[in-house]
């Protein structure tokens, strides 16, 4: 029979055992220790609920065992070290430092270890620990903390492919001791990525499985011929036992996932490349954009993974070239690092040349990222675009990367189908098309500085350059040359057209105010539009040679 202190330890641990202990798992182990008999095991196994099995297990163990050692050994053997540590610390503090028992053992230590167990049971992936984007991680924690009292909500974590959305979500859930276990009772993390109509049904079938307790897994019903209405009803019933669960839908592509989650009134953290899927939600929505790494972050990122820092101007130029070509994309930088063997700047310079000559497939390797190359991930983004948006993206290849370009110049090459010759309507249609590309995968980025401009990053341009056929590139250059010539012949120095109504708040009273002459101005002025290709002659000469090869 256990002594009083050990009996109290088991009583204190009862709540924890309810969360994370199945007595059936321990029966065979303890039979081998001659603590339980076959009759004891049969009695416990026949209990219909886990709560009954736990209660009878503890009742028998208190009377049959002489110490907690065998049970502690089982918890270590069963990868439940947080339970073993709790019992050991309880006994130690209860005997040697009883005043510290509650604050030291019962509260903080167990909550952290229980969090790890909850993350494991919730299918939350283990992510990198050597580098954390503190700003983004803390924003996710803050938003989830602020929204925890809402009946249902969506927090959208959106950004370009390979920007680290899933990593940030996982790091936020692992970093905070308050989110899982206090603000939210439990968590369910599932990868979506589906594009087929049946994908949503399969995803929520997995949710039903995750919501079921271990008691029900062996009796999990077949859903092969179940309708979506019945499946939703089954999930609602399962949510009665898991009312305060945070759901993480990773890499959502279809808005149908959002519609299902809204019908079920779930609390959701969603990672996606397409922020437009949020339009399907009518509940409370919050957004966090995951941008590319800044230059100093790129240095820290590579240094955290063991890349030596540059010594001298030549090595610094090589590293800056890598950062420029990757556009600060974490997944691409990771591929650079994994491919850079030995870790020298000579090898990195070779990879830069390979990337420029062969495109993103030139740096292809296995990393923690889901794809071997970013080209595969971007291709998947393109596949879900409409034909009109794909066509617009293809012609974006004739624009120089890293340059903020006014919509007027984009209108020279982006194909749109309108029945009017009005320049204002044309520019509005082109602006809408480019905005969609900036929302659906961050394929472009837009600014108002103070006119509306759009920019294509180096990494997106490099991708397009090697997937768009040469004839389309040649046609785009030819069309741009012709349109710029027409603009020059019309002597358009100051646009006379009206600014669209939805841009009115950015309107200036004169052209000189619209395009202020400051040393920081980087946007091409209207009178320089005809000279656009001359200003970027090196780029266009290179692109023409590439299209001719």
UniProtKB/Swiss-Prot annotation:
User: What protein am I looking at?
Assistant: Cell death protein 4
Q: Where does the CARD domain start and stop, copy by copy?
A: 1-91
Binding-site residues, ATP: 131, 162, 164-167, 273, 367, 369
Provide the protein's localization: Mitochondrion; Cytoplasm, Perinuclear region
Subunit notes for this chain?
Answer: Associates as an asymmetric homodimer with ced-9. Only one ced-4 molecule within the dimer interacts directly with ced-9. Upon release from ced-9, forms a multimer, known as the apoptosome, and interacts with ced-3; the interaction results in ced-3 autoproteolytic cleavage and activation. Multiple oligomeric states of the apoptosome are observed including hexamers, heptamers and octamers. The hexamers likely represent a pre-mature state of the apoptosome and may contribute to the regulation of ced-3 activation.
**What is known to happen upon mutating residue 234 to E?**
Loss of dimerization without affecting interaction with ced-9, loss of ced-3 activation and severe reduction in the number of cell corpses in embryos in a ced-1 mutant background
Q: Which gene encodes it?
A: ced-4
First-listed, main subcellular location of the protein, grouped into a coarse class: mitochondrion
Please provide the record's keywords in A-Z order: Apoptosis, ATP-binding, Cytoplasm, Magnesium, Metal-binding, Mitochondrion, Nucleotide-binding
Q: Which SUPFAM superfamilies match?
A: DEATH domain, P-loop containing nucleoside triphosphate hydrolases, Winged helix' DNA-binding domain
**Amino-acid positions noted as binding Mg(2+) in the UniProt annotation, renumbered to this chain:** 166
Where does the record place the NB-ARC domain? 133-417
Q: What happens when the gene is disrupted?
A: Mutants exhibit a block in almost all programmed cell deaths that normally occur during development. RNAi-mediated knockdown causes a defect in egg laying in a small proportion of animals. Also causes a moderate increase in CEP neuron survival in response to high Al(3+) levels. In an ain-1 mutant background, enhances the proportion of animals arrested at the larval stage, with egg-laying defects and with a ruptured vulva.
What Gene Ontology biological process does one annotation of this record name? positive regulation of synapse pruning
Effect ascribed to mutating residue 258 to N: In n1948; no effect on the interaction with mac-1
Function text: Component of the egl-1, ced-9, ced-4 and ced-3 apoptotic signaling cascade required for the initiation of programmed cell death in cells fated to die during embryonic and postembryonic development. During oogenesis, required for germline apoptosis downstream of ced-9 and upstream of ced-3 but independently of egl-1. May regulate germline apoptosis in response to DNA damage, probably downstream of let-60/ras and mpk-1 pathway. Regulates CEP neuron apoptosis in response to high Al(3+) levels.
The GO molecular function terms of this record are: ADP binding; ATP binding; BH1 domain binding; BH3 domain binding; caspase binding; cysteine-type endopeptidase activator activity; cysteine-type endopeptidase activator activity involved in apoptotic process; endopeptidase activator activity
**Annotated Gene3D superfamilies:** Ced-4 linker helical domain-like (1.10.8.490), Death Domain, Fas (1.10.533.10), P-loop containing nucleotide triphosphate hydrolases (3.40.50.300), Winged helix-like DNA-binding domain superfamily/Winged helix DNA-binding domain (1.10.10.10)
What are the GO cellular component annotations? caspase complex; cytosol; membrane; mitochondrion; nucleus; perinuclear region of cytoplasm; protein-containing complex
The organism's superkingdom is given as Eukaryota
InterPro entries assigned: CARD (IPR001315), CED4_WHD (IPR054317), DEATH-like_dom_sf (IPR011029), NB-ARC (IPR002182), P-loop_NTPase (IPR027417), WH-like_DNA-bd_sf (IPR036388), WH_DNA-bd_sf (IPR036390)
Q: Which residues form the signal peptide?
A: none
